[in-house]
A protein has these predicted regions:
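Compact beta-sheet-dominated domain cores in extracellular/mature segments
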Residues: 1-123
């Protein structure tokens, strides 16, 4: 008699690549997290894929490290071929990926304090 199998998946799933167009080295992260310095991961992230079953999942891109300065909020699944083309004023230097809907006020609080909400991993 076969036993039922239970599979648990953690969202969101963030796949980051060291080169544009989803090439080069790849690393996959799961769960709510913040990457404080993109250059410290794979010697720089050039493209990414963000996936969640929640349409309100949020990806926040910052143009300075440690979640500072200007930010851009994206909702839902995203495939970004060239990360540095997203922000008009500069390169993406840090990001937050979460399965929750982050409001602009919550992002400004993170920006002001430099601290992620409870339960988030800091990379």
């Amino acid at each position: 008699m076969n036993k039922p199998v239970s599979i648990s998946r953690t969202y969101p799933r963030l796949a980051v690549y060291s080169q544009e167009n989803f090439r080069g080295l790849r690393r996959v992260y799961r769960g709510n997290l913040g990457i404080a310095d993109i250059d410290a991961v794979l010697t720089g992230i050039e493209s990414l894929r963000f996936f969640s079953t929640n349409p309100n999942a949020t990806l926040v891109l910052f143009d300075r490290s440690r979640f500072r300065d200007n930010f851009f909020i994206l909702r839902g699944n995203r495939s970004i071929r060239e990360l540095d083309d997203i922000l008009r004023r500069g390169d993406v230097e840090s990001l937050i990926a979460t399965n929750q809907r982050l409001t602009a006020a919550q992002v400004r609080r993170i920006q002001r304090t430099g601290n992620l909400p409870p339960g988030y991993r800091l990379i």
